[in-house]
Amino acid sequence: MNTLRFPAGLYGVTPEWDDTSRLLAAVRDAAAGGMRALQLRRKHLSREQRLLQARALAPLCRELGVTFIVNDDWRTALEAGADGAHIGRDDATLAEVRAAAPGLLLGVSCYADLNRARELLAQGADYIAFGAVFPSPTKPQAAHAPLALLGEAAAQVRACGEPRPAVVAIGGITPANAGLVAAAGADSIAVITGLFEAPDIRAAAQACAAPFPLTD
């Protein structure tokens, strides 16, 4: 048995698009190609603008059966009716968010730090994210997380019992290298440019999702 707290496979992350209609259409295409989770990541929007996009995306994701996560802003996740929130190093602690919003799925950034992952797993993280596994156009200065790290992280989450937390990889992932990441031990891949800037979003989603068995 290998059940997960977070969907395996393709985890789309939104580009910096202000055109919500364009974004909704792209999410439909990605879901048709096999995307199973979506993160709203809008670093440069005001909280009010982010909430507007989140409220547009949440019902669409429910319709499509896509798990919906909001980056960096658990309050917006709650207000919009999202499934969860992603917490970075500079955000509130996982324990603080868990206490305030016990119903949310909570994912955390671990960068290339297995000790951080171990601590956050002990606090109940639903997924641990590592990256950048490849050079990233979104974060060109991001520290490198070697693929071998994913296998070590996979060993950590297996000790957590069932359903277990997921290991997510991010950074420079494309249809061409998704298989390498899956083989290294990732349960899920977070993809921005390689998905939403592709000429055919549905085909890119299919190619990114193909290496991942639907085991959760």
UniProtKB/Swiss-Prot annotation:
Its EC number is 2.5.1.3. Its cofactor is Mg(2+). This is Thiamine-phosphate synthase. The lineage of its organism: Bacteria, Pseudomonadati, Pseudomonadota, Betaproteobacteria, Burkholderiales. Belongs to the thiamine-phosphate synthase family. Pfam families: TMP-TENI (PF02581). 2-[(2R,5Z)-2-carboxy-4-methylthiazol-5(2H)-ylidene]ethyl phosphate binds at S136, P137, T138, G172, I192, T193. Mg(2+) binds at D72, D91. Binds 1 Mg(2+) ion per subunit. It comes from Bordetella avium (strain 197N). It is an enzyme of class 2 (transferase). 4-amino-2-methyl-5-(diphosphooxymethyl)pyrimidine binds at Q39, L40, R41, R42, K43, N71, S109, K139.
